[in-house]
Each structure stands twice: as C-alpha cells, then as structure tokens.
C-alpha cells in the first residue's frame, strides 16, 4: 500500500487553514486553531485514530468559533480524501461503542465515497466553557462531507457535556482507525462490488 499522506488548505475571508495528515501514523498531533476545547478534541481524534495530524487555523474568532471549526472539518476531510486515493485495500466499515465514565457513544463508519451524517447526539447545555456544543455536529458534518464517508453517531446516554463531546470524537477516531486499516485478505482490492469508492 502506498504511503497515505496528504495536505489540504482553505483560505477565505473568514479563515486561513492548513492541514496535513498521515493515515498510517502513531497518533501524533500538532494542533493550533485558537479554540482551546476544539484543539483538545482534535488531539483526541488524532491520538485514537493513529492518524498523525498537523492543523493550523486562523479564523474570525472575534465573531465566534463557527467558521474556524467548520472550515477545519472541511480541510481535514479534503486531506483525508487525498490521502486515501482510490481507497484500495481498506476494511471500509467499522463501528464502536465507546465508554467514558457515565457516557456511552456509538460511531459507525462506511468509507464509501458517499458523504452522509446521521447525528443522534443531544447536549443539556449550549456551551462547554466558551465552546458552542452545536459546533460538534458542524465539525462532523463538514468532515463527513469532505472525506466522503457515511458517519452515524449516537450518544446512548451521558450526563456530562464534556464527556458526551469527547466520546463523539474518540468513538469516531476508533471507528476511523478500524475502517482504514489494511485488509490483509484483499490488499489491493477496492472493497465494493462497483469497483469504485469514488461516490
């Protein structure tokens, strides 16, 4: 399997973002978005997926965090799409239930080339510190759309909003790790009867 690494950037009047990923990494991350809680979540995404990530983001944080979070999801998804190429030799599907104290969250992934998000997660507060909880969904929507993955995220239960958000990132990370693993029985095959995972 060829090295699965790529870069992507996005520059608008609202944000200036650069991302690099190495899918077959060890979970090293170098994250600086200007949004502390989001940096923490991206670090979890990298660490538990074993995807090495470098993220640099400058956004209009004087307005709010929305553009920075969403556009980082866009750039990260685009980098993953480039890194995966034809998506040959991958397991493609994965799901995981991930526990953190009182919280349990499920993530299921199909690296299909067809972007879709099903989101069954609710928060009891609009904020975690200064971070808008609605931005968790916005990030995963942007990631799924631009990475070409079908992603289902369901929070079964939980009381702590930080834990709910963190289990979303960790569950998606662990599911991504499993779905992107090389398939030793089909090392050069596109895992689709269509012969393509381009959408």
Swiss-Prot record:
PROSITE patterns xref list: IGP_DEHYDRATASE_1, IGP_DEHYDRATASE_2
GO molecular function: imidazoleglycerol-phosphate dehydratase activity
Family of this protein: Belongs to the imidazoleglycerol-phosphate dehydratase family.
Organism name: Mesorhizobium japonicum (strain LMG 29417 / CECT 9101 / MAFF 303099) (Mesorhizobium loti (strain MAFF 303099))
One of the Pfam families matching this protein, by short name: IGPD
Main location: cytoplasm
Keyword Lyase: yes
PANTHER family, sorted: IMIDAZOLEGLYCEROL-PHOSPHATE DEHYDRATASE, IMIDAZOLEGLYCEROL-PHOSPHATE DEHYDRATASE HIS7
Gene name of this polypeptide: hisB
E.C. no: 4.2.1.19
Pathway terms, separated by semicolons: Amino-acid biosynthesis; L-histidine biosynthesis; L-histidine from 5-phospho-alpha-D-ribose 1-diphosphate: step 6/9
Reaction it catalyzes: D-erythro-1-(imidazol-4-yl)glycerol 3-phosphate = 3-(imidazol-4-yl)-2-oxopropyl phosphate + H2O
Protein's cellular compartments: Cytoplasm
Domain of life: Bacteria
GO biological process, one term: L-histidine biosynthetic process
Key words, A-Z: Amino-acid biosynthesis, Cytoplasm, Histidine biosynthesis, Lyase
CDD domains per the UniProt record, alphabetical: IGPD
Protein name per UniProt: Imidazoleglycerol-phosphate dehydratase
One cellular-component annotation, GO: cytoplasm
């Amino acid at each position: 399997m060829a090295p699965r690494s790529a870069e992507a950037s996005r520059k608008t009047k609202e944000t200036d973002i650069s991302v690099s990923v190495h899918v077959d990494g060890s979970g090293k991350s170098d994250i600086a978005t200007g949004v502390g809680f989001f940096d923490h979540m991206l670090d979890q995404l990298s660490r538990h997926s074993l995807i090495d990530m470098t993220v640099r983001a400058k956004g209009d944080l004087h307005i709010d965090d929305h553009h920075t979070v969403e556009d980082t999801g866009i750039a990260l998804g685009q980098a993953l799409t480039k890194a995966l190429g034809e998506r040959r030799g991958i397991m493609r599907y994965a799901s995981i239930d991930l526990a953190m104290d009182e919280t349990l969250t499920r993530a299921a992934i199909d690296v299909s080339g067809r972007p879709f998000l099903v989101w069954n997660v609710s928060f009891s507060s609009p904020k975690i510190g200064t971070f808008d909880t609605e931005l968790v969904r916005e990030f995963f929507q942007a990631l799924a759309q631009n990475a070409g993955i079908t992603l289902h995220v369901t929070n079964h239960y939980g009381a702590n909003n930080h834990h709910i958000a963190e289990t979303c990132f960790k569950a998606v990370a662990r599911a991504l790790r499993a779905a992107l693993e090389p398939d030793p029985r089909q090392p050069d095959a596109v895992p689709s009867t269509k012969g393509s995972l381009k959408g």
